[in-house]
């Protein structure tokens, strides 16, 4: 079974809290936004969306810039 191309990860203080994989980027982006809303108030929270095929971080919260 394929885990999916797009991975969304929520970490708190660098430790993984939850991860999910989706084949569709639009679905993964919706889940990313949902998890920012659900978990963004946790101390040290970070949410990332990565294209597992290319290794590129597509978006992250909070913004690293």
PLM regions and their residue ranges:
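Short aromatic-glycine-(Arg/Gly/Cys) micro-motifs in beta-strand/loop hairpins
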Residues: 1-18
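Surface-exposed loop/edge segments in extracytoplasmic proteins
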Residues: 15-20, 55-59
């Amino acid at each position: 079974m394929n885990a999916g191309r797009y991975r969304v990860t929520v970490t708190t203080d660098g430790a993984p809290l939850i991860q999910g994989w989706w084949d569709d980027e639009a679905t993964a982006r919706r889940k990313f936004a949902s998890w920012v809303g659900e978990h963004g108030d946790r101390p040290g929270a970070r949410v990332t969306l990565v294209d597992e095929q290319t290794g590129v971080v597509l978006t992250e919260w909070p913004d690293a810039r």
